[in-house]
A protein has these predicted regions:
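Conserved class I S-adenosyl-L-methionine
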Residues: 5-67, 80, 84, 101-104, 163-194, ...
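Class I SAM-dependent methyltransferase SAM/SAH-binding core
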Residues: 72-74, 78-123
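A short acidic, Gly/Pro-enriched loop at the edge of an enzyme's catalytic core
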Residues: 124-133
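A short SAM/SAH-binding and catalytic strip from SAM-dependent methyltransferases
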Residues: 132-146
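A short glycine-rich, Lys/Arg-flanked "PGG" loop and its adjoining helix->strand segment in the class I
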Residues: 147-162
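Acceptor-substrate binding/catalytic loop of class I
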Residues: 167, 171, 200-213
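Short alpha-helix
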Residues: 206-229
């Protein structure tokens, strides 16, 4: 999760508070219910520093020329990445576990858009070897076990197809938790719960963090070859008022890690 400094919470932004830290699989009730604040989150996502000027541009840059390519967006949310890919000529399909998010994506993309309510890590109602690319933007870190999700995404990709993804950076997560007074073991896979407040609504979200080698091992086990690992900067057109001080003075540690994987 990309945490902004305590002194940086622009209007419409998301404020966060670390609630708990655990290696247990069980989480609090109602956690990760994006449907409960879909509209508020989608509105913030449109213009926030983290999404509009950092993560989404980086994903589009890694995707590069997508004209004519069939792309599946896994965990599409309200569809901002899907729309950007379609505007670049891609033939797009998306799914999300939140029906509320899928409805917002349908309003954005139109009633004829290929959108599904489905959960990452469960079997998808899609045929084998269908897509040239799959994008997974900030979704894998909600899962304890990446194996089933990666295997299913590999199944729907054509041989040689690409999985383009972003996840929380394990180095940044470990540093944040240490600054919060916790004692995380870097080599462990563990989860933490944060309280998000956006537009006056407060929800609990749970994220799983794991070391870099656990990520790369999971990719290889699922039948992927790593072709790119990226830690991109923010875009140069970011409005200055959105830049946290630690970004402006170059003291910022990238909070997301990006990969391009090839289906082998």
């Amino acid at each position: 999760m990309c945490r902004m400094p305590n002194d940086h919470n622009p209007p419409g932004g998301i404020s966060t508070r670390l609630v708990s830290f655990s290696a247990d699989s069980a989480g609090p009730p109602g956690v990760n219910d994006y449907g409960s604040f879909a509209g508020a989150y989608a509105a913030s996502n449109e213009t926030s520093f983290v999404n509009a000027y950092y993560e989404r541009p980086a994903m589009l840059a890694l995707a590069a020329d997508v004209a004519g390519r069939r792309i599946l967006d896994a965990g599409c949310g309200s569809g901002p990445l899907l729309l950007a890919l379609r505007e670049r000529g891609a033939i797009v399909t998306g799914f999300d576990k939140s029906a509320g998010m899928v409805e917002l994506a349908r309003r954005r993309l139109g009633d004829d858009a290929g959108l599904l309510v489905a959960e990452l890590g469960s079997p998808l109602p899609l045929p084998d070897d269908t897509f040239d690319d799959v994008t997974a933007s900030l979704v894998l870190h909600y899962l304890e076990d990446w194996g089933p999700a990666l295997a299913e995404l590999r199944r729907v990709l054509k041989p040689g197809g690409r999985l383009i993804l972003s996840v929380d950076h394990p180095f940044a997560e470990n540093l944040w938790h240490r600054e919060a007074g916790l004692k995380p073991e870097y080599s462990a896979t563990y989860n933490y719960v944060v309280e998000w407040t956006v537009d006056g609504q407060t929800v609990l979200l749970r994220f799983w963090t794991r070391p870099l080698h656990a990520m790369t091992d999971a990719f290889t086990a699922a039948g992927f070859r790593i072709t790119v690992i990226s830690e991109p900067p923010v875009t140069p057109d970011t409005p200055r008022e959105l830049l946290p001080l630690n970004v402006a003075d170059r003291q910022w540690i990238p909070c997301f890690l990006f990969f391009v994987l090839e289906a082998v």
